[in-house]
Each structure stands twice: as structure tokens, then as C-alpha cells.
């Protein structure tokens, strides 16, 4: 009887141990799994309508703010906001719109000035010196004068560049012709020296031959 009781106790112990192995404890759950569960809970909460608030220690969580970036050509668009449309009768709105347009233009100009300007070499005919030409309003007379001045400067620079390129071409041609004539002269002189040396050697050989055999011609 005691033996049966001991066997039953052993079976109960083994069964309880197997149950404990199959059921993991909370602290034994991997950290990634817990993090994934919290993310799912947060997503579910945001889907329900609640805004997601990030903890200070949570590096992966970010408060996302959608910022609309504007193109350079879109004058009506302002960075960080939607395009503002004004009514025709609303003068204040139109003035505000013009003010924003004036503020954005210097920013774009500064960005362009920060870029490196390409400098042309004297021999490079394809390269052209560019001058920035600002677009003028119809009512601004001073701007028109400045615009014409810049265009004139650009034209003069292009013409002077073309003249310089034309001058350099004949100079290079003269140099090449001088080089060719000098090379021809040197080659002719070398040939003459070579012939003279050959004739001299022949005369010396002939004199030695006569001395050897005491021949008189």
C-alpha cells in the first residue's frame, strides 16, 4: 500500500513539473516580444482615436508631424503649411501673400549663392559666363534699368570671350608652323652631316689602301 502511495506521489510531482515547464513566466518572455505587444497595443489605441504619446525613455517612439515641402516654382505655397488662397476682394490677404513671396525670394537666392560658381578658362570656348537676371515687375522702372544693364554686361562678356578665342587661334597656328619649319631644317642638317661623315670615311679608307700597297694613281 505504501509503495502505491509513493508511486502516485512521484507521478503527481512529474506531472506538475511538466506543467511548469510548458507555461513560461512573465519575466521569462523575451524583451522583443513584449515590445511588439506594446506597439500593437499603441497602434490599436491610435486606431481607436486616441493620440499616441511617447515616453521620455522610448527612443523608437516619435511624435510625427507632417510638414509639406514647397517647390521653388510654387509662389503660393509656404513651407510648413498648405497653399493659401485669397479672395479677390480681400486686400489684406493679397498683401500678406506678397509679403510672404518677398520673404521666400531672398531664401532661394541665398541658397543659389551658396552653390559654387563655375569659372571659365580662357581656352574653353563652350563655357559661358552667366549673369543672374532678376525678373522685374511691370511697375518697377528701376528694376528694368538694372535688368538691361545686366543683360548688356552678359553680352559684352560673351563678345570679349569670342574675340580672345579668335586671337588665340592664329597665335597657335603660327607657333605650329614655326615648329614644323624648325624640325624640317634640323632633319636636313642631320642628313647633310651624315653624308659628309660617310664621304670622309671613304676617303680615309682609300688613302690607307694606297699606302698599304704603294699604289700611285
Swiss-Prot record:
Biased amino acid composition, Basic and acidic residues: 24-47
Keywords in alphabetical order: Developmental protein, Repeat, Signal
Induction context: By PKC.
Tissues with expression: Expressed in tentacle-specific epithelial cells (battery cells) as well as in a small fraction of ectodermal epithelial cells in the gastric region subjacent to the tentacles (the tentacle formation region). The later cells are committed to become battery cells.
Basic residues bias: start-end ranges: 98-110, 149-188
Signal sequence coordinates: 1-16
Region (Disordered): 24-58, 72-205
Stretches forming Sequence repeats: 32-81, 98-147
Location of region: 2 X 50 AA approximate repeats: 32-147
Biased segments, Acidic residues type: 48-58, 72-94, 114-145
Job of this protein: Responds to early signals of head formation in hydra.
Protein name from the UniProt record: KS1 protein
Species per Swiss-Prot/TrEMBL record: Hydra vulgaris
